[in-house]
Every structure is written in C-alpha cells, then in structure tokens.
C-alpha cells in the first residue's frame, strides 16, 4: 500500500492549516465544533483547491506543460488558484467560466485578471453542452502554436487531486493526537465538484473508520454526487492500493441547502455568514461555506447530527466572493 506522500507533489500551500475550536458557536449548537482553516492555505488567495493543485501541478510540470486550461463558475475559487499556480510555474492560464462577461471585474474575477489569465465566458444556459468543446478548442489552439496544454477538470476533481484531502485527513489526525482528542464523529464540508469529498471519504475510512462525512451540495442533486464521489473515491483508493470498496450508498449528501441555484446566495447561507462572523470572527462566503454552514446548523437542529457530537467543519476558503455580493449581504 502507498501513502499520499508517495506521489509527486509541488509545494504551494502553508501546511498544516489550523484546526480551530469554535466554542461559542459549538456551545450554541450543543456540539464540540472545530473548523479546519483551509481558507489559510495561503497561496493565490487560499482555499481548499491548493491541496489538489499540489498534485495536479506536479503532473503539469512533469509533462512540461505550457498552457493550463480549466473551468468554473463566474466567481470560481478553483479557477483563480489554477491561474496563480500556472503563473508560479511559468505556464499560461486559460479560464473558461460559466457566466456572461461582466462590466466590472470584482472578487475572483479581479484576481484572475491580476494573474494574467485569458478568460472566456460561456452563456450559463449552454455551459454544460459547450464546456468540453470550448476547453478542447483552447488546447488545440495551443498545440497549433507548438505549445503543450493540460486541461484540469472542474474543481480539480480527479483521483489524483483527491489525494490532497487524504493528506488533509492525515494532517487533522496528527493535530487531534497532539491535543489528546479522539477522532471526530462527523465532518461537514461543502461540495461543488466532488473531489474534496472523495479524498475525505478515502482518508477517513483508513484513519477514522467510524467518522461520518457529510457533503453539503452547493450545486447538484444528491444522487449525482453519490455516483460521482463514490467512483472518484474508488479510483483514489486504487491509486493508493488501499483495499477499499465504494458504492453510491456509502456517500452522505444533503442537497437541500443550494437555494435557487449554484453561485446565487441563499437566505439561510447569508444568515449563517452573519452568525459565524458575529459569534467567532470567522468569514464565510455566500457560494460555498455559507451554504455548508447553514447545512451544519440545520442538521444539528434536526438531530441528524446528534447533540454532543464532535464535529469538524472544513472551511474551503472563498472570501473573495463576499465582495461581488456586498449589496445582497447588506440588504439581507
């Protein structure tokens, strides 16, 4: 069997990130609550995708890539971090984003511009039918120029990228052992493309077999994620040569906290942003972590997360997305 450190990885983030106790919020919910501060990964504005990109950019460097192409939403944290990582290793970033070209560049779009990314915008209604062709067209254009291109899928959600969150479990395991504390009962994390959840599932089964993982969807329905994440977890475990078997029924997804659509702030998510900011001084965002925290709060209130549980919330970053939604937040 292999370990996550057996795979080639570049150094991008500042690890280990803190595992911070949220006493005020946890007490109000009747649980022991820690937050894994992957908003503090540091590189390119921080966030969970740094863990995945350490493996994915090592692959790009090994292949001597000139152009890195990826996709995401209008305010994609993943796309922003791919742009930063590409520049660090002397590669050109191309971002194909879901949404119309803005009149003003704010939040992650501003940072994309600062990193010098080439941006293409796809109409939201046709995005899913056009995205593969659009990214392939950029790869073909690079090849015609004599350059080598690499396409990184949405969210960096690949079995190789998922190793980043196997490593995160190993990191948290060491942090809890240093504290003299047991494994958590529950881990809660947002999911938009599935790679983070796949890595958490694989790592937890190895190190914390009794810990439940809850993915709070910010985009798709539960059954789509269950199929996708179980397949990715299986492929990730196979990479590691760990004897694990995964089915869709193994994956716990809550899809009732999306709101009207991906990338659109929800009332419950905004309430959670205010609550956490005013209870703990921690900033969440309206696209991912606000909705995921809304899910965590609701699941504790409903008893789906039992009173007295030890809970870890994975903060995947995304604070640049607060600013484009400033008026929505202030009018709430």
PLM region descriptions:
Residues 1-332:
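PLP-dependent amino-acid enzyme catalytic core
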């Amino acid at each position: 069997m292999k370990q996550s450190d057996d795979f080639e990885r570049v150094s991008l983030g500042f690890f280990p990130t803190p595992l911070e106790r949220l006493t005020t919020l946890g007490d109000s919910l009747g649980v022991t609550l820690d937050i894994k501060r992957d908003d503090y990964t540091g590189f390119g504005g921080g966030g969970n995708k740094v863990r995945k990109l350490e493996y994915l950019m090592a692959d790009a460097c090994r292949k001597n890539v000139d152009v890195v192409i990826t996709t995401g939403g209008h305010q994609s944290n993943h796309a922003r971090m791919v742009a930063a990582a590409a520049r660090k290793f002397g590669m050109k970033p191309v971002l194909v984003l879901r949404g119309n070209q803005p009149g003003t560049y704010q939040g992650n779009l501003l940072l994309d511009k600062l990193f010098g990314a080439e941006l293409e915008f796809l109409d939201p209604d046709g995005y899913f039918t056009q995205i593969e062709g659009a990214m392939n067209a950029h790869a073909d254009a690079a090849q015609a120029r004599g350059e080598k291109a690499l396409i990184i899928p949405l969210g960096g959600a690949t079995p190789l990228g998922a190793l980043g969150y196997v490593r995160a479990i190993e990191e948290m395991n060491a942090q809890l052992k240093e504290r003299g504390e047991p494994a958590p009962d529950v881990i809660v994390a947002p999911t938009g493309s599935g790679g983070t959840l796949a890595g958490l599932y694989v790592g937890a089964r190895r190190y914390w077999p009794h810990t439940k993982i809850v993915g709070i969807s910010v985009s798709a329905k539960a059954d789509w994620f269950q199929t996708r994440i179980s397949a990715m977890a299986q492929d990730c475990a196979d990479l590691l040569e760990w004897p694990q078997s995964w089915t869709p029924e193994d994956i716990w997804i809550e899809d009732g906290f999306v709101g009207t659509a991906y990338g659109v702030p929800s009332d419950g998510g905004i309430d959670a942003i205010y609550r956490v900011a005013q209870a703990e001084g921690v900033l969440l965002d309206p696209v991912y972590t606000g909705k995921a925290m809304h899910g965590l709060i609701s699941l504790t209130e409903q008893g789906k997360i039992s009173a007295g549980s030890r809970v870890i919330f994975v903060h995947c970053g995304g604070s640049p997305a607060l600013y484009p939604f400033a008026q929505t937040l202030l009018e709430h």
